């Protein structure tokens, strides 16, 4: 199975894809959307069709106390819209601290601030997807 990982931010969507075996996640690209969700859904649908994706894993931001805040509500709403747009399963994956982990990894790798801004969302999507794949494989 081939998966698409998504990290939905307020202005960008980080994406990652798995290999055909569903074992390894790789950063794909970052899509700027500026809250134009209809266009964003269309772009995701195109990716799903072009790359022959079997399922989507969407990052689900929960608060540290396990409650669902405004960003979590946005992800739930986006998941509903995705399910209406693509005819494949959409799974939620807890994404707490993934962007921080991605940023920390880039800083440790001496990646410049300018470059970090371009890749942090797709790296966060990769972490989200790899976490899901690892959990699924157990």
Predicted regions and their residues:
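Phosphate- and other anionic-substrate recognition elements at nucleic-acid/protein interfaces
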Residues: 2-3, 13-138
């Amino acid at each position: 199975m081939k998966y698409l990982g998504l990290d939905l931010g307020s202005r960008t969507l980080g994406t990652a894809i798995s290999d055909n075996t569903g074992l390894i996640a790789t950063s794909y690209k970052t899509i700027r959307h500026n809250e134009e969700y209809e266009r964003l859904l269309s772009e995701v649908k195109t990716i799903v069709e072009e790359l022959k994706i079997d399922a989507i894993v969407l990052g689900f931001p929960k608060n540290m106390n396990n409650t669902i805040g405004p960003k979590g509500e946005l992800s739930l709403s986006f998941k509903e819209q995705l399910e209406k747009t693509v005819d494949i399963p959409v799974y939620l994956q807890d994404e707490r601290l993934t962007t921080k982990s991605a940023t920390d990894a880039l800083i440790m790798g001496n990646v410049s601030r300018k470059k970090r801004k371009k890749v942090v969302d797709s790296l966060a999507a990769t972490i989200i997807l790899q976490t899901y794949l690892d959990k699924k494989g157990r």
